[in-house]
Amino acid sequence: LHLAGNVIASLIFVGAVGRWLGSGVAAGLMLAAAVAANLLTAAVHGPGHDSVGASTATFAALGIVSGLQLVRRWRLGPLRRRAWLPIGAGLALFAMLGVGERADVLAHLFGLLVGALVGVVVGLRARRRAPAWVQVTAGALAALSVAGCWLLAFTR
């Protein structure tokens, strides 16, 4: 049930990012933000902390959506007063879905925060979607990275 929730939420949030940036770039950014968040979590927890990272990736995607929306609203002028609402919405979803008895709360929080930072930076820099070859390359690298990690996990 937990995994199914992650898959559904990731599809929703990556789909939202994909509408703005393209699906390959969205998958690559989500993975990069999740990796950074998991590295931060590992640095805080130290050795011996195990984490699969699917939830972290879900919260990274939520953070990217929140960061992109913040920049979008800020640029619209009249909505500047409400520009921070997407960040608040992301934090509210984190409070509802990211904490729990056996949840890796720190990984979820770092996923949201790193994702929001990525979303803001990309939102400020990207003026249009990347070309198709970039989308395919980013998506393929993300998929190969995940497959490689699972291969390593199962062969150790």
Model-derived regions, located:
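A detector for small-residue-rich transmembrane helices and their helix-helix packing motifs
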Residues: 1-156
